[in-house]
């Protein structure tokens, strides 16, 4: 498979990142295909084949996707996250 080669793995991840940002900028609302691409990007970004993989990369990518697709609700999400981290 192509995913076993680290160079190919990064290439596929970059293609998906570019595809996702293109689709998100042209789409007025999220749909299933965008969610599938976003999930693939998160999966690829957390792979052990990528030297920059890890929780920080995954969290940053998830945050970026969340901001793009749910900009108005993102503020509420951050407030709830802060509240739960402080009080629980």
From Swiss-Prot:
It comes from the Viruses. This is Uncharacterized 9.8 kDa protein.
